[in-house]
Amino acid sequence: MSWKRISMSAFLVLVTKAVVGAIFFGLVFTDVHEGAGTAFRAEGTENHGIAMVGYVAWSLAFSFVFARGFENRGWLEGVRFGLIVWLLYFVPMTLGIYGYFVVGPEWMLSALISGLAEALACGSVAALVFRNAPMKTAAAG
């Protein structure tokens, strides 16, 4: 496990998450997101700094867990890891938001779809960073 690779992966995963999120909620699902009404903070009142801390932590954790058990297995392993993350993170979070906030089923469906795209893209990026990772060698003793 190389901290240099983990750092590189975390940065690229963070950028990938931001790009995919911007594409889906900034371009594809704009009407759905705007229709959420009072469920979310109004434009200009968001706490971007707090959100960024969460995104950085998520990207670091994503990359660290990937490095601990999924490196050197090819891009399909990244897709599988992304699917696992989607099931463990995006699905429960989205259903929880739908259950407790004033959002419609269209928002829930769009969040599940964009979350799947984010998780699969981030898993693929991590797999590219961790391909052919240096093999661990036993310490000379």
Residue ranges and their predicted role:
Residues M1-G141:
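Juxtamembrane/disordered regions of integral membrane proteins
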